[in-house]
Amino acid sequence: MKVCVIGSGGREHALAWRLSISPSVTKVYAIPGSAAMSDCAELVGIDWQQSDHLISFLKDNQVDLVVVGPEAPLVAGLADVLNKVGIPVFGPSKAAAQLEGSKVFAKNLMKKYNIPTAAYGVFHKVDEAKTFIAQIGAPIVVKADGLAAGKGVVVAMTVDEANEAVEDMLSGNRFGDAGSTVVIEEFMEGEEASLLAFVDGKTVVPMIASQDHKRIFDGDKGANTGGMGTYAPAPVLTDALRDEAMKTILEPMVAAMEKEGMPYVGCLYAGLMITDEGPKVVEFNARFGDPETQVVLPLLDSDLGQIMMACATGTLTADMVKWKDSSAACVILASKGYPETSSKGDVISGDIKQYDTTIVFHSGTKLVGENYVTNGGRVLGVVGLGKDLRTALDRAYGRIEHIDFEGMQYRTDIGAKAFK
């Protein structure tokens, strides 16, 4: 079958790469894709927002399935537009994508269906938010309601820091409409893990658990980012805890979405905190994580195209999804100034080819002449594969020694928590 991937980042590079080696897939298109994706997909210069052009292309080329990578097209309702004209989509409807698009929607739904998460309040006015902060005390978590590219969350260690975050979001207009409402949550103690699942509207099949590293610097210091590295499997989410998360979080949420009249199709991403009381929800995302995808998909031992089509057509079964008994680690190489700014146009030198045990996924690059240059905050995701995590990490970091660009920054402690 022919599959079209929407998006151009590291996650989409990983999706296109994995689909291109799936037996059921004969052709992969990418809209718009990136130059680096041309080794596994045909790039198509269409804007997904021009739905007439997009639909014409998909119909003319007899595309069987569309896989939407980023959150913005989902929250904008791209799946609805394509489903309406009979094109199967791996990705949720506009209504279902609110699970990521609105933190208030997600928190209220979790409360209604008793899905474990942090206690919270929702605020539009600065003074009311500050009163709540004074009552709860610090540490406390302040979140912008809408999409903020993974950066709309402040874990405030002091009341002053929390008040500043509230002012920044509600008065300072830091995230525009996304920050016109804030969710303030109790701080949860524990270790985070990402549990992604394939969903067809009813059936939920978990992927291998991974762990992201959100902060820019080693030791979880510095500003929040879109993610500086991941590894899988993550030992913090034992089989027993994964089963508990499925029973208390993912399965009830998918059942709730169906009951609410907005069945969920695609990848459901549960960001979890493993607390003393068991797994609790930090956030839901309505798509594959970036950079979780870069470690989860290389460990898949099944046909990704077949699984995604089954999700899109309501025919998913657990036996379709098998995993390799090995490990993967991804280290993000970011440009200078990230996450506050990003440097564009710095030439990337060294070896960025694909090998059996190391893969380089391009998050923010551009081909200028014969050279790739930086074109975003997160530039490359260097993935190491191995029989165990130590081997995978050694391969990823070993590969990084052969890659360079001006101001290149990365964390040296990805996966360290697994060896505690």
Where do the model's predicted regions map?
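Short acidic-hydrophobic, aromatic-tinged amphipathic segments that line or gate anion-handling sites
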Residues: L43-Q49, G121-K125, A156
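Active-site "cap" helix and flanking loop/linker of ATP-utilizing ligase/carboxylase catalytic domains
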Residues: M246-L268, N285-Y355
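A conserved helix-loop-beta module that forms one wall/lid of the active-site cleft
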Residues: P92-G152
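Solvent-exposed alpha-helices and their adjacent loops that cap or buttress functional pockets
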Residues: I21, A36-S38, F90, K112-N114, ...
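Peripheral (often C-terminal) accessory segments that flank ATP-dependent C-N-forming ligase machineries
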Residues: A310-K420
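ATP-binding N-terminal substructure of ATP-dependent carboxylate-amine bond-forming enzymes
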Residues: M1-K94
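Internal nucleotide-binding/catalytic subdomain
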Residues: G152, A156-T293
